[in-house]
C-alpha cells in the first residue's frame, strides 16, 4: 500500500477511534477498544475499502504508534489522544430488558432516523424507570416523549452499558433499531 493511502486510513482511524466514533458507526468500550470488523465497515462507509491486512499494516507502520491491536487481533484502539472519555472506571453492566429516555418531542423524528446520540457528552443517558425519564424530559421545553430502548437486546448484540453511581445507565449510542416504536407522551 502506498504512503498516501496509509495516511488517509490513519487519519480516518484517528478520527473514529480518538474523536468521533459514531461518525464511523463505532461504539468504543470503556477502554477504547472496538471490534476490527466494525472499524472495517465504518471505513467502507467513508469510501475506504480496507482489508484486515491493510489495517494491520497501518497499525504496524504508524510512526507514532497511534493504534494497538488486541493480542488476538480482533479489536483495535487508539493508544492516546482521545477527545472522548474512554475510561470512566465503571465496569460493564448487564442492563434490564428496557431502559427509558426522556426528551423533547421535537427531536423524536431525528432519533427515529439516527438513534440516540450523546451529543456533547461521551454517553447517552438512560433511565431505569418511567418516572425518572419523565423528570428528565420535563427539563426540556414543549411537549415531551419517553422513548423505550431495548437495552438487553443491545447488550446481547455486543454494545456495552455502564451504570453510574447515581443510577443513570450509560451507553455510547442507541441505534434506531433498538428504539421501540411506541412511547409515552405528555403535553
Which ranges hold each PLM region?
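Eukaryotic, polar/proline-rich low-complexity intrinsically disordered regions
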Residues: 1-187
Amino acid at each position: 500500500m502506498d504512503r498516501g493511502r496509509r495516511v488517509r486510513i490513519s487519519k480516518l482511524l484517528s478520527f473514529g477511534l480518538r474523536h468521533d466514533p459514531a461518525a464511523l458507526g463505532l461504539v468504543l468500550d470503556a477502554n477504547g477498544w472496538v471490534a476490527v470488523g466494525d472499524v472495517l465497515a465504518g471505513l467502507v462507509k467513508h469510501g475506504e475499502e480496507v482489508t484486515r491486512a491493510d489495517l494491520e499494516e497501518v497499525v504496524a507502520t504508524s510512526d507514532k504508534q497511534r493504534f494497538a491491536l488486541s493480542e488476538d487481533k480482533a479489536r483495535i484502539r487508539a493508544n492516546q489522544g482521545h477527545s472522548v472519555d474512554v475510561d470512566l472506571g465503571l465496569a460493564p453492566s448487564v442492563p434490564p430488558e428496557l431502559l427509558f429516555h426522556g426528551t423533547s418531542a421535537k427531536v423524536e423524528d431525528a432519533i427515529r432516523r439516527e438513534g440516540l446520540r450523546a451529543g456533547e457528552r461521551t454517553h447517552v443517558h438512560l433511565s431505569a424507570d418511567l418516572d425518572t425519564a419523565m423528570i428528565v424530559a420535563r427539563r426540556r421545553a414543549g411537549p415531551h416523549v419517553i422513548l423505550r430502548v431495548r437495552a438487553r437486546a443491545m447488550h446481547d448484540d455486543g454494545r456495552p452499558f455502564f451504570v453510574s453511581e447515581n443510577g443513570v445507565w450509560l451507553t455510547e449510542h442507541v441505534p434506531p433499531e433498538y428504539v421501540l416504536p411506541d412511547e409515552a407522551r405528555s403535553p
